[in-house]
UniProtKB/Swiss-Prot annotation:
The gene is pufQ. The keyword Endoplasmic reticulum does not apply. It comes from Cereibacter sphaeroides (Rhodobacter sphaeroides). It holds the Pfam family PufQ. This is Protein PufQ. Required for bacteriochlorophyll biosynthesis. Directly involved in the assembly of both the B875 and B800-850 pigment-protein complexes. The keyword Cell membrane does not apply. Keywords: Bacteriochlorophyll biosynthesis, Chlorophyll biosynthesis, Photosynthesis. Belongs to the PufQ family. One of its GO terms (biological process) is bacteriochlorophyll biosynthetic process. The lineage of its organism: Bacteria, Pseudomonadati, Pseudomonadota, Alphaproteobacteria, Rhodobacterales. InterPro entries: PufQ_cyt-su.
Amino acid sequence: MSDHAVNTPVHAARAHGHRAPRAEFYVYFAVILLGGFPVAFVSWIVSTIRHRRLPKRGPFASAWFDAKAITPLIFRA
């Protein structure tokens, strides 16, 4: 008989999925955030003028969301 409790999905997820972010991750995140903020600000202004109301997310929240989505893609490659 084999022991199926050795490599349970819980242990596999802990071993591969959750690593502590390193300084390099935070540097890339900051660079992407600072580079994305002017673009998000301009698009926020254009959207405000076109629709004559404020968007749901502000420019900083939009840049934060983009940096949060893009940075992990760099480290997965």
